[in-house]
Amino acid sequence: MHPPMSPKRGPHRLARWVLALLLALGTTWLAPAPAMAAMDVAKQVLIGADFHDQDLRGATFNLTNLRDATFAGSDLQGASLFGAKLQDADLSNTNLREATLDSAIFDGTNLTNAVLEDAFAFNTKFTNVVIEGADFTNVPLRGDALKTLCGVASGTNPVTGRDTRSSLGCS
């Protein structure tokens, strides 16, 4: 047999239990939502895909065929486009900061006003690209790619305020 509960002890125990429950529920409701996992569409054929104005930070497009794809206005910071085929793709007004672009093919690609600051693009192929207003600050490029880009570089990036030719180090 249990001793009878004191009238003073019972309500306090219940109040503490309710308070603990409310605190536990409150912290789960107030906790920040977990970040969405980055999109991974490596080795896909996404010809003509529409990704405009999307948050694609950290996404993986490695070895993906993105011919004629639209990324205009998207945030691709830290994304990996290693070996991606971006012929005639629209990457105008995109954030490509810290993106991996190594071995990607940019042929007829529109990079107008794109920010590529700190992107890795050493073995990237650039032909017939539009780079007016693009910012290539701290982007390692091979000599042949740099020569091609300096031949068409013009404008000032509206986000960073940097001149395209200066960001490439063109003479």
Language-model regions, residue ranges each:
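Tandem repeat scaffolds
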Residues: 2, 6-18, 25-171
